[in-house]
């Protein structure tokens, strides 16, 4: 089940296909600009400098002993191991991560980092490893509604239903978009995503829309009460390297492929969500 949830990063179709094409073009362009030797240094020293903002659990945070822990931290360790290195974490405020990368203070940024097309002149992005987009959630065992994979299309699934959302969030915007095409769809705004999911469990709403991170956190804390049935939007998390660290960028993508194929990424998702 967790494996299938992780693979939902690929269900968005068009958006992620365009992203993968853009990433491939970016890497091809970078190949004509030479390599800065970062991969050689990483392998020679056995150290991969990883920039992150350790204030975003469960992706990255500090434990009581000051150690960096979380999904991204474990991903960095697994990725570094495939490069025959150990990660050296550099804790930086999120707004300073790109500057640190471009100033050669870190080799990669692994920090719940969304793909940003405006940055592709300066950095190479990896393939996505997590989709933090908006998802549709139902109560577990709700026999009145049928989830993804059924023959019931989305308009019929939600017609005449109430959907809980965090007011003013991307989920709220997505619900407003759905209301334009789904008859009698009502929204139930809540102060936070967690409260929107709580309203679903309490029976105040028939469904909820929230970002995937909030949903996975809620599912972890409330085992068996809700189920994710549809990915509605894509917000891929990616790893960034400098534009001239093209060999390192390729090694990162190769490592991610290996971690995905080996089931390591699924195992990390199960551990942290």
Residue spans for each PLM region:
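Alpha-to-beta junction loops
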Residues: 48-49, 84-86, 102-111, 161, ...
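Short helix-initiation/N-cap motifs at beta->coil->alpha
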Residues: 36, 89-99, 149-152, 187-198, ...
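Ligand-binding cleft/hinge of the Venus flytrap
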Residues: 60-63, 76-85, 155-157, 171-189, ...
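Flexible hinge/capping segments at coil-to-helix
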Residues: 139-163
